[in-house]
Swiss-Prot record:
Protein name: Uncharacterized protein YicS
InterPro entries linked to this entry: YicS_fam
Gene: yicS
The organism's place on the tree of life at top rank: Bacteria
Database matches in NCBIfam families: YicS_fam
Amino acid sequence: MKPTMLLMITVFLIFPAISQAESPFSSLQSAKEKTTVLQDLRKICTPQASLSDEAWEKLMLSDENNKQHIREAIVAMERNNQSNYWEALGKVECPDM
């Protein structure tokens, strides 16, 4: 009885770790989500000067509060929760340009 129970506990502890291991495409998915968030932020915070995507990203992520709100938006996107996504983006402060 004990070996069977021990095996069951081991399986239940190991299986979630295996299923949540990062796939080879997870970084691509993360990059896509980040790009989508930054594109939506460009619609909300229209820069007056034409900035490159990299400069725009650095500007938006230069504030710690903005970083947190962008992380919240990405989590909401992963969970397919549009209302939380737009709520998180609405909290991002547009930088002065």
